[in-house]
């Protein structure tokens, strides 16, 4: 059984999909006016982990993540850079996808852009106008009148807008100050505009997600549009509250059966955000740390809790990943990188565990999945993995040639890779991380000279070269197939 903390009900509850064996999951993607930061990374990793778990358990998952490419900040950026809004959006979408790939985040099944879904937005706004939930102001803006939605505030338990007045545009044009914009009329040469049935303008932020869910994901004849709507906890109010309201008013049903929200990444006690100027951009972090090391760190705190970024904690968490790769090195040749793992292969792996492994391995996978199915209890899951790594190493120390046991370990590692997105590199490449190509070539050259010295029985030179490399933090391992090396 899967349990999750539903943000609407404010408690952990059992998860039951709307339709058997299917899950429709929507995650709010980035507003593409700047590079992605570690807050974006964490949110993407969190819901990538949920998606992997659902897939592992056999669900057919349709995963949608949007790009907001119409926004005040994008317009401002385009003016600053003398570039079109389309150029700004395309550039940062490409940058975002590149960063996510480096972090091992699976691509969404559908990645709609706001600019590609304007007809659906206009259609929903027309429906809201026709039903009397929306009205047009004096400046051609169209607002949702929230007091007509008797369930407004049910998701966030909030009614009052707490943002600054800068977020409340044209307050004098509203019937009530908490009414929010569905459509923003064209304001002049520094604005952008699209044709619509209500004149030139552009959509408000909230209507974008509702319209894209209706087009790409929603069930049309169910009590709820989709199974799960997810995003950062900063989106709960007003964004998700407003999404829920306008969809409810337009369609007569709730937008989602369950709501999931992840916690912030904090730097010096403040939420990481572009507007605060404390963003640790992913592209900058990747210059220092490999994406898998960042992923391993960011998934290590329960998804609903705030993560206080600390490089000491990051380096400490890397030791956990080192231990995983060292066990992998004992059972898989160092140059072999994991292939893309399918569910059928996972089924075969688990079958092998039941058929050939010791009792400890039989219970590993079920214990791991049970922990993850409990509102993604990552602390318990990592403890289970740590126990498996330690137990496996202890057993192999005494029984280094037990092939059946090694096969079971391979299966365990493959399941960890599928579920957590960790351990997919070859051990050789993992233990050589952080070195540029020039340095690697210099190391390989010294190793070749050492091999030549050994062939000529010049053991003094061979030992000297080994010592030189060791002083540089490089350890050489001699095997029947030749010499390999890793960064200590």
Swiss-Prot record:
Assembly notes: Monomer.
Disulfide bridge map: none
Cellular component aspect of the GO annotation: cytosol
Residue interval(s) of motif 'HIGH' region: 30-40
Keywords, comma-separated and alphabetical: Aminoacyl-tRNA synthetase, ATP-binding, Cytoplasm, Ligase, Metal-binding, Nucleotide-binding, Protein biosynthesis, Zinc
The protein, known as: Cysteine--tRNA ligase
Single GO BP term: cysteinyl-tRNA aminoacylation
Compartment annotation: Cytoplasm
Family: Belongs to the class-I aminoacyl-tRNA synthetase family.
Record field: catalytic activity: tRNA(Cys) + L-cysteine + ATP = L-cysteinyl-tRNA(Cys) + AMP + diphosphate
Top enzyme category: ligase
Gene source species: Helicobacter hepaticus (strain ATCC 51449 / 3B1)
């Amino acid at each position: 059984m899967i349990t999750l903390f539903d943000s609407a009900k404010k408690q952990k509850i059992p998860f039951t999909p709307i339709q058997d064996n299917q899950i429709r999951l929507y995650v709010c993607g980035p507003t593409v006016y700047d590079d992605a930061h570690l807050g974006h990374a964490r949110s993407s990793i969190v819901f990538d982990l949920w998606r992997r778990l659902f897939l592992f358990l056999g669900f057919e998952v349709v995963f949608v993540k949007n790009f907001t490419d119409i926004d005040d900040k994008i317009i401002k950026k385009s003016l600053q850079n003398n570039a079109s809004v389309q150029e700004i959006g395309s550039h940062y979408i490409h940058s975002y996808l590149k960063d996510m790939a480096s972090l091992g985040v699976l691509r969404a099944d559908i990645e709609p852009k706001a600019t590609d879904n304007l007809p659906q937005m206009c259609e929903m706004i027309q429906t809201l106008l026709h039903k009397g939930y929306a009205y047009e102001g004096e400046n051609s803006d169209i607002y949702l009148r929230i007091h007509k939605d008797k369930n407004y505030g049910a998701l966030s338990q909030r009614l009052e807008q707490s943002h600054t007045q800068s977020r409340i545009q044209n307050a004098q044009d509203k019937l009530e100050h908490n009414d929010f914009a569905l459509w923003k009329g064209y304001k002049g040469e520094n604005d952008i505009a699209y044709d619509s049935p209500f004149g030139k303008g552009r959509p408000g932020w909230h209507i974008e997600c509702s319209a894209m869910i209706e087009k790409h994901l929603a069930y049309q004849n169910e009590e709820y549009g989709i199974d799960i709507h997810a995003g950062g906890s900063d989106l709960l109010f007003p964004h998700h509250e407003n999404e829920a309201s306008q969809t409810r008013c337009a369609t007569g049903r709730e937008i989602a059966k369950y709501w999931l929200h992840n916690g912030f990444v904090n730097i010096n006690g403040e939420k990481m955000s572009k507007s605060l100027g404390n963003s640790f951009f992913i592209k900058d972090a990747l210059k220092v740390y490999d994406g898998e090391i960042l992923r391993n760190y960011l998934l290590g705190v329960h998804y609903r809790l705030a993560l206080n970024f600390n490089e000491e904690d990051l380096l400490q968490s890397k030791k956990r990943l080192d231990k995983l790769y060292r066990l992998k090195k004992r059972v898989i040749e160092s140059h072999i990188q994991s292939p893309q793992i399918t569910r059928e292969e996972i089924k075969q792996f688990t079958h092998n565990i039941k058929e050939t492994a010791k009792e400890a391995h039989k219970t590993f996978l079920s214990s791991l999945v049970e922990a993850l199915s409990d509102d993604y209890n990552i602390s318990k899951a990592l403890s289970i993995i740590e126990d498996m790594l330690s137990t496996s190493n202890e057993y192999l120390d005494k029984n280094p040639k037990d092939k059946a046991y090694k096969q079971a370990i391979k299966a365990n590692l493959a399941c960890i890779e599928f579920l957590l997105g960790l351990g997919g590199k070859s051990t050789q490449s993992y233990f050589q991380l952080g070195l540029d190509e020039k340095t690697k070539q210099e190391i390989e050259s010294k190793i070749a000279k050492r091999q030549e010295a050994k062939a000529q029985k010049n053991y003094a030179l061979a030992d000297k070269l080994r010592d030189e490399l060791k002083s540089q933090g490089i350890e050489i391992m001699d095997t029947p197939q030749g010499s390999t090396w890793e960064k200590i």
